[in-house]
Amino acid sequence: MSASTATTQGIPRHVAIIMDGYGRWAARRRRPRVIGHRAGARAVNLCIDFCLERGIAALTLFAFSSENWGRPADEVGALMKLFLNALDREVGELHRRGVRVRFIGERSRFDAGIIARMDAAERLTAGNSRLALSIAASYGGRQDIAAAARALAVEVAEGRLDPADIDENALSRHVALADLPPPDLFIRTGGDLRVSNFLLWQLAYTELWFTDTLWPDFDAALLQQALDDFAARERRFGLTGEQVATASTTDTIAS
């Protein structure tokens, strides 16, 4: 893959975000953690608006990790209630704006009411194409890769796949978001410098961008700063800078 095929005029095709800092935002205001999660909904809508305005094709948000089930029961319960309310409140408007909604992760761990709404949101928006919004809920990157490996094992056991044919492309077909380009830009708010088991396979060549800003305070100016920094980087995909420059020139002439 050349750098020129990954983006259009420096605009990433796919942005992935870890929305971190809800609890600290609330603690600084001496409020319960759930208040931080409620405040973070504004930043989610802002990012969706931004992607629609800039023509970014895909946005993936890490909403709830597989490890988050281990948090205190009252916090998990409050988060599930917020999640349910958000599905009821936002999906119709997302559909009206041409957003396709999808959920990745272990859906079976949610209660029946949430699963039904997730399924309904995906059915309602399946034909939309302005923005592919993927919400990682009860998701873990290692879990994702393990599930892909199990799928390949089934194909081998059923005689549909020769083990000698298992390569990166074969596994890529079975991980989450297989129908989307890999994320070009990863953003994490809240100051931590790690990917926290998020899209481990998909982030192999993604540009990483971190900010100390807590998620409820994330705004369009910061998102634009992330895009500006992304546009200034040279993405080499394992090649030398000279090779990338030559490929970019060739692509420009061909177009």
What are these language model-derived features?
Residues 1-255:
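Flexible, compositionally biased loop and terminal segments
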